[in-house]
Amino acid sequence: MVTGDGNQLMEPTRYRIETKTRASAILVLAGVALVLIFAALPAFAGRGLIQDLIFVFYMLALAQCWNLLAGYAGLVSVGQQAFVGLGGYLLFALTIGAGIDPIAAVVLSGLIAAILAVPTAFVVFRLRGPYFAIGSWVVAEVYRLVFAQFKQLGGGTGTSLPSSATNEIFGIEWVKAMFEVRSPAARDIITYWIALVLAAGALSLVYLVLRSRYGLALSAIRDSEATAESAGVDSFRTKLGVYVLVAATTGMIGALIYLQKARISPDAAFSVLDWTAYVIFIVVIGGVGTIEGPIVGVIVFYALQRYLADFGTWYLILLGALAIGIMLFAPKGIWGYVAQRYSVALFPVRRMLVRPRE
């Protein structure tokens, strides 16, 4: 570039923003390989291990959903059990009342949960901070009381899935022939595969959201909603989108949980301890606001539950003491501490400013 007086000016350097890295490409390949290994596991593993992994997968998916809502959008909810229970009851209603195949009912439960999340959002989004948390819990209690009134679904005592429904799940005959197992074990294998898909899907969903402009908007709202709106972010629509997305995913997870259990009751389906307190524990000890945190947290939680659950009340006391200790000495969680100390990220979501090659 030459100016009017003959002086030559340097061309401005143009930078570009990259989200894809070599590490992320390797991660995708490793993730696909790991999912394929897990998918083939029923051919070699016993039924006990399969049932344990179902639990790990759906708790991981629930933790990722709560982490997306609270850790990235700043919507700290203690009412996640609302959509777990809703999904479970919708599964029973669709299967028993409408005669729909349970696998199709799992998907439909998520879609209906997403639809019902819209009017719910218009209520709870009027609240801020701790009031939002309390409001989300109240919504869950309202759902619990409502479903306790449906006599067709067992009322307050609950009901069970009929054997005709659980023994005729789509693909069960193929699984029985392939693995030479009976109907209960075949149902566990099908449930295991769906749980694996939901866990991998939840991880992928969170990762893709955080690497998008939508993820930037969520983080901006979490840090300062007023500042985000002044920059042009529609905070209500952004929060509504993530709330509905989490509701849909959580609804499908809830439907899957009670497909495996084959029995449901209002107190169990809308349990704040099982579906929110434990999930918050997983995210807190692993690391809030990181994708890796819930993975670490669910491994720790599974190990503690497997080896210490027989101690009764002492087990819950230990969980509480561990959570308090982590919050005091490693506020960013186990993974947050490791990532800060060693500068490592399994799921890189940062954007890099790259100068083009000459």
Task: Report the location of each language-model feature.
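Transmembrane alpha-helices and adjacent helix-loop boundaries
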Residues: V2-E358
